[in-house]
Amino acid sequence: MDAVEIHDAGGPYAAKGFFYRDMKMDSLVPSDIVAWDESGISDKVLDSFEKTVQYCKKNNIELVCVTSPITPTTSVNGYSEQAGAYFTRLCEEYGVEYYDFNLLTMDTLPRTDDDFFDEEGHMLGELADRYSDILASVLLDKCDKSTAFYGTYAQLEQAVYENYVTK
């Protein structure tokens, strides 16, 4: 099956759980963004993460954790910084590499809220293709990570402000 059209999916099913969304909406599909609360992470989830880390280390499998980008506006107005800090600490504690792709510079991955289907970060197909290329280059160590990512959310917020508010 090459593609299946699913009503309300925003585009055809391409494969492996990927809908190639190309539908431009008048506005983002609203989402119920939940406040970040690290106390809401269950012991069961942490136990599963620890078992995954142990399995990968025992079997010489490189485990890399990532947070994929969400809309620029939501990433600076929501809880991304708190979540990113939590996952950074968690991954450092277990010796696992972690990348917060919300912090990709706007030069590395130009994006606006219009490149997304909803506030949760479901990308339209064109952005998903560009992000996949960048993700691969980071994982394959084929890019300069020191210039591909902002160092802080304050730098991201400044770039979002410069790109959206002042233009």
Please name every model-derived segment.
Residues 35-42, 72-77, 117-122:
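Second-shell loop/turn segments in exported
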Residues 77-167:
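C-terminal regions of proteins
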